[in-house]
Amino acid sequence: MNLIEPKFKLLVYDKKQFKDKDEANNNIALIKNRILDYPKECSIKEIAYYCTNGYPICFSYGIRNNRSSSKAYRDNNWREQQLIAIDIDNKDRQRYTTIDEAICLCKNNGITPSIVYTTLSSTDIINKYRII
């Protein structure tokens, strides 16, 4: 039996890879212009590849009302989203949550993460990660 892997609609990502958070932040305006108008359909495997290899990714899709406006892509333009991503930055050291603890919390609440990965801003001292 061949199983068909589902594709998630209206997912956008940038074709440029970034090696660190500073480089990505310095290019945020360019990234937004490149990705906002080009939704893609991606499988979980494809999404995992993009997320873990430094590609900027957005899990929602919206309509820009004005291409030249920096405020053209806002909440009121949001149209659809099939995946939810939760960022754990562990800013509060007294409430530090390990990846294993976060996965356990999800499962205890009926949520099974599809992808969990450390983000570009993660360090050996403060683990930062995303759960999808």
Language-model segments: residues:
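Signature for HUH/AEP ssDNA processing cores
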Residues: 1-129
